[in-house]
């Protein structure tokens, strides 16, 4: 086999072209920067984080369901419970924070006050 090595330098990047057939080729490209005058991005899905206060009486229920949330968690089950569908049940007087998750990320929080 006839190996032919050709060093090509383009735009301060050196490339080694190794040709088995004995023919090496290189193509130089123009890297002149282009200024962007106007850009618009339209997301196909906007994530809305819900952070709000929720006053409840003992025994009341309220749905904090969000279709993008994958899991719900309460920091105080004695005050407010939440099920896998986002239904909050007020258990006793006090405060609790319901955290909504999307995967492992915090999606939003609902601050429950039971009176």
Swiss-Prot record:
Reported induction: Expression is induced in response to phosphate starvation in a PhoR-dependent manner.
TM region positions: none
InterPro entries: Big_2, Invasin/intimin_cell_adhesion
Domain of life: Bacteria
Signal peptide (residue range): 1-26
Domain BIG2: 36-114
UniProt keyword list: Signal
Gene3D superfamilies per record: 2.60.40.1080
Name of the featured protein: Uncharacterized protein YjdB
Natural source organism: Bacillus subtilis (strain 168)
Gene coding for it: yjdB
């Amino acid at each position: 086999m006839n190996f032919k090595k050709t060093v090509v330098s383009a735009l301060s990047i050196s490339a080694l072209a190794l040709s088995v057939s004995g023919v090496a080729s290189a193509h130089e490209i123009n890297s002149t920067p282009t200024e962007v005058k106007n850009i618009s991005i339209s997301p196909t899905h906007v994530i809305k984080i819900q952070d709000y206060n929720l006053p409840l009486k003992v025994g009341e229920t309220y749905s904090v369901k969000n279709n993008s949330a994958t899991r719900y968690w309460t920091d105080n089950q004695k005050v407010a419970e939440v099920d896998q569908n986002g239904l909050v049940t007020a258990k006793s007087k006090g405060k609790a924070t319901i955290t909504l998750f999307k995967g492992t990320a915090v999606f939003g929080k609902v601050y429950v006050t039971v009176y």
